[in-house]
Amino acid sequence: DSLSEDNWKFVVSSSCETILEILDIGGCAKGVAEYT
């Protein structure tokens, strides 16, 4: 389980810095995929 809750929060905050980016699921998922 390399992706702990804290790491996940970091990924989300880094990949989806704004509410609009969070709502942009495609962009958010792409950022998470690139991180992992």
UniProtKB/Swiss-Prot annotation:
According to UniProt, the tissues expressing it are described as: Expressed by the venom gland.
Per UniProt, the keywords (alphabetical) are: Calcium, Cleavage on pair of basic residues, Disulfide bond, Hydrolase, Lipid degradation, Lipid metabolism, Metal-binding, Secreted, Zymogen
Q: Which reaction does it catalyse?
A: a 1,2-diacyl-sn-glycero-3-phosphocholine + H2O = a 1-acyl-sn-glycero-3-phosphocholine + a fatty acid + H(+)
Gene Ontology MF: a single term: phospholipase A2 activity
The record's subcellular locations are: Secreted
Question: Can you supply one Gene Ontology CC term for this chain's record?
Answer: extracellular region
GO BP field:
lipid catabolic process
The EC number on file is 3.1.1.4
State its cofactor. Answer: Ca(2+)
Q: Which proteins does it associate with, and in what oligomeric form?
A: Heterodimer composed of a small subunit and a large subunit; disulfid-linked.
Q: Which family does it belong to?
A: Belongs to the phospholipase A2 family. Group III subfamily.
- What is the protein name given in its UniProt record? Phospholipase A2 hemilipin-2
Organism of origin is Hemiscorpius lepturus
